[in-house]
């Protein structure tokens, strides 16, 4: 044997490890020529008590395993096509239309800008979700060293449109969310309208004689309203 493929070597090792009873049912014959190597198995069929001859042609290749008759170029191309088809069809079908999912998830008015309110997935009338509405901002409250810290998310408003009032132990925060195109509203042609305008409002009530209203401070940073007020000692 001048050049034996590693696959055939493994098969021969496996045969040599058979017990005597197994060796009576299996025989191997090795043939070699310039181009191909073949391993002939004689497998005994216990039901018919005869032998079936299985001839497995193995292309002669070296350690790199660059070519094999078990996976020719045609089979490789078929696998590539099947893989591409999986990503083009099964993946897309499994997750559905992403744009439709996003449109269905939007909790405000989607206005198609040619004058009608009918996105591709459904018809959404103007009275269903008004453009002007009230928002209750998300609030985070904590206390450090007798100082109450309040954070509210009110993105999209100008700091001059934020009003904070503390009267009779009731803290009221109001912020108006204006349109970004007030001067051009009647002139421009909208391609899509998914933004509502309105008012942020949050009312917090403290226990009587708990906070000192003269110590209240507020600042607006990156869409977050920060309020601090001292408690009575």
From Swiss-Prot:
Protein name: Small heat shock protein hspF
InterPro entries, sorted: A-crystallin/Hsp20_dom, HSP20-like_chaperone
Stored SUPFAM superfamilies: HSP20-like chaperones (SSF49764)
Residues in sHSP domain copies: 129-233
Family: Belongs to the small heat shock protein (HSP20) family.
Membrane-traversing stretches: none
Species annotation: Dictyostelium discoideum
Induction: Up-regulated by phagocytic stimuli.
Keywords: Stress response
Gene encoding the protein: hspF-1
């Amino acid at each position: 044997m001048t050049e034996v493929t590693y696959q055939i070597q493994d098969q021969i090792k496996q045969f040599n490890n058979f017990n005597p009873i197994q060796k009576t049912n299996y025989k191997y014959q090795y043939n070699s020529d310039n181009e191909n190597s073949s391993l002939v198995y004689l497998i005994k069929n216990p039901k018919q008590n005869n032998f079936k001859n299985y001839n497995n042609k193995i292309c002669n290749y070296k350690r790199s395993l660059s070519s094999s008759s078990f996976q020719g170029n045609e089979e490789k191309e078929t696998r590539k096509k099947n893989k591409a088809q999986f990503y083009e069809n099964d993946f897309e079908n499994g997750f559905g239309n992403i744009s439709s999912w996003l449109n269905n998830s939007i909790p405000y008015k989607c206005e198609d800008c040619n004058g009608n309110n009918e996105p591709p997935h459904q018809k959404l009338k103007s009275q269903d979700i008004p453009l002007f509405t009230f928002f209750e901002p998300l609030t985070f409250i904590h206390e450090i060293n007798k100082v109450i810290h309040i954070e509210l998310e009110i993105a999209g408003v100008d700091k001059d449109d934020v009003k904070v009032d503390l009267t009779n132990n009731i803290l009221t925060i109001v912020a108006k969310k204006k349109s970004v195109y007030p001067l051009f509203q009647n002139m421009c042609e909208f391609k899509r309208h998914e933004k509502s305008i309105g008012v942020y409002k949050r009312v917090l009530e403290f226990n009587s004689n708990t906070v000192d209203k003269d110590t209240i401070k507020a600042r607006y940073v990156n869409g977050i309203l920060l309020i601090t007020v001292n408690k009575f000692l």
